[in-house]
Amino acid sequence: MVLIPFFENASQIVPNCQTYPKHQTALAFFIFYHKWTEYFGDSNYAVRGMLEKVMVRWDTEKKVSKKGYSLNGESFENRNIIGRVESDTLTWVWQGYDHKISQSALFHELVHLALRAKYGTADPDHEGTKYRGWTRLHSSMIIECKQMLQSFNL
């Protein structure tokens, strides 16, 4: 377990020394929070509080989910996934294409955790209508976060 600098009790579990130096993950967290507050605000610091105690468990392998929802809210069974929220403070994330955080599902999973911290539900059906919380703005924010991180070649 590696502590993430600037985020009091945040940590990551990495499968090897190449997956991801703590300063890269910290930069991703800063970018996420900057964009979150720009898009949605955080007047009660619920999202900042979540980032202070989150644990990211990085993995080199994708997983198969027995059930879940696509980004547009359609249910699926037995599909490869690249990230999953496992509790209020724990998320599992596949290391990403080309071994880059910007090519992983980290920002996507942080949105789920932020929604859970802010509204009490992680909104598993994303832009679907079964659960509320996730909107197209959240999806747009993720794209902007990834683009910002890509500018650092991460």
PLM regions with names:
Residues 1-99:
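A metal-dependent hydrolase signature that marks the N-terminal structural subdomain at the beginning
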Residues 107, 111-115:
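Short active-site segment of divalent metal-dependent hydrolases/proteases
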